[in-house]
Amino acid sequence: MPQARWHGPQRRIGVTGGIASGKSSVGLYLSEQHALPLLDADIYARDALVAGSAATMAVLQRYGNAVAEAGQLNPISIDRIALASIIFSDAQERRWLEQLIHPIVAKRFDVALADLSAEPVVVLMIPLLFEAKLSGLCSDVWLVDCSPAQQCQRLIARDGLTLKQAEQRISTQWPLEQKRPLADLVIDNSGAPRAWRDQISSIC
């Protein structure tokens, strides 16, 4: 059953999609061209794993030197590439990390939204909006859509992954076809950028 939405006076646009579907481009466009406050789940997730944080200590306790940044003593930083190699290849470990990080991210959103309560519209950029059950933070959900082949191409070009690695990372998220019926607006990012900009501008 779909999660209930936010029904307060503030309009909260949740921007989601698949990996490399173009969420960041849409979120930044809304922020820069329409002067809307932008809250980014990826930034909150990265902040959760800074050196010395409780989440970082939990990760280091679980994986030890396998994810410890070489050459650092105290506080120890996490080698994010090493951690990614673990969680993208093991569903159980990925679920463990998500259960650790998602509540931290949700709390950061709560604090930020309270600070922005006077703003009429806020944009929330949340890649795992449905997976993390965060759609209840949003009054509107916009899904940035493209084909799986385009996701692969963009991941390979952006992150230097192999085709197998790109497909593996895409498979860790809900497929876009599963997310489309849950969205209020599907933004087609399979063609020229100008197309989705026109689509957004017509409703903002």
Curated annotation (Swiss-Prot):
It is found in: Cytoplasm. ATP binds at residues 20-25. Its EC number is 2.7.1.24. GO terms for molecular function: ATP binding; dephospho-CoA kinase activity. One of its GO terms (biological process) is coenzyme A biosynthetic process. Keywords: ATP-binding, Coenzyme A biosynthesis, Cytoplasm, Kinase, Nucleotide-binding, Transferase. The keyword Transferase applies. It catalyses: 3'-dephospho-CoA + ATP = ADP + CoA + H(+). Residues 12-204 form the DPCK domain. GO terms for cellular component: cytoplasm. InterPro entries: Depp_CoAkinase, P-loop_NTPase. Pathway: Cofactor biosynthesis; coenzyme A biosynthesis; CoA from (R)-pantothenate: step 5/5. Belongs to the CoaE family. Catalyzes the phosphorylation of the 3'-hydroxyl group of dephosphocoenzyme A to form coenzyme A. NCBIfam families: dephospho-CoA kinase. This is Dephospho-CoA kinase. The lineage of its organism: Bacteria, Bacillati, Cyanobacteriota, Cyanophyceae, Synechococcales. The gene is coaE.
